[in-house]
Amino acid sequence: MACGSSMNSFDMNSIPLVALNYTVRHRLCLYLNPNAVVAADWTRLAEEMGYDYLEIRNFDRYPDSTMKLLEDWQKKCFRATVGGLLEMLKKMERNDILTDLAPLIEADCKKYLEKKHGPLPLQDDNVDSSEQYRITKSDDPYGSMPETFDAFICCCAQDILFVQEMISRLEQTDYKLKLCVFDRDVLPGTCLWSITSELIENRCRKMVVIISDDYLDSSECDFQTKFALSLGPGAREKRLIPVKYKPMKRPFPSILRFITLCDNTNPYTKVWFWDKLAKALAR
């Protein structure tokens, strides 16, 4: 990768950011935390990562803004790799960081690859079963890079035909979105509630709630919706996207009335339905 360093023996874009240990992160913070006049600091890095002004201001309230930024980017961005970080530092013209940290980064990447290609570690008896390495079909078996999704699909079994249409419209087209469909993607043998919570809170950027009369009778859908709403008033409006795809006989759920509905039953707006939904999931 063209990062101006000597780390040519690795494909840095294939190594997740989690490979970088505390020493590298701490030294990176020492470089980027101070407000420098001539050198780009952590706020410029946040801009390169795609954060907006209000999000960057929020990071500013933490004692170690750079460390918090790295943790958040690693958690939210599906493409948070060592290579991506190095490319941004190069774009910021922070060659001093690249030169100083290159040996440490290379060492961490070697350790990560050695661990990845070694034997699977045994699960600690003190670790709860909900924290096992694999909970979805495509999870990294070593736990280094959990599988992430654009959206968790909250639905009941009676609406599965519409979910299948969503898959064909959103995953198998130019939108190339990645949906988390519980019955398709989650491995059996895990605790239903804890795995669902993990997926909604940490693995999926959004949650599509498919509203129907059958949805109102589903205890699983009720739990998923209320859990997503409990994650915080600042995030829940952006996280939840209610979808109505067929007429209902029963009242619309009151807890979702304050969130804009994506309605596929309105004949006047039906033509824009899939494009609007795809853009809402991608933003």
From Swiss-Prot:
One of its GO terms (biological process) is defense response to Gram-positive bacterium. GO terms for cellular component: cytoplasm; plasma membrane. The keyword Nucleus does not apply. Transmembrane segments: none annotated. One of its GO terms (molecular function) is TIR domain binding. Pfam families: Death (PF00531), TIR_2 (PF13676). Residues 106-143 are annotated as: Intermediate domain. Residues 27-105 form the Death domain. Residues 147-281 form the TIR domain. Its main location: cytoplasm. The keyword Iron-sulfur does not apply. It comes from the Eukaryota. Disulfide bonds: none annotated. InterPro entries: DEATH-like_dom_sf, Death_dom, MyD88_Death, Myelin_different_resp_MyD88, TIR_dom, Toll_tir_struct_dom_sf. Keywords: Cytoplasm, Immunity, Inflammatory response, Innate immunity. It is found in: Cytoplasm. Gene3D superfamilies: Death Domain, Fas, Toll/interleukin-1 receptor homology (TIR) domain. Adapter protein involved in the Toll-like receptor and IL-1 receptor signaling pathway in the innate immune response. Activates expression of target genes in the Spemann organizer region during early embryonic development. Is required for normal axis formation. The intermediate domain (ID) is required for the phosphorylation and activation of IRAK. This is Myeloid differentiation primary response protein MyD88-B. The gene is myd88-b.
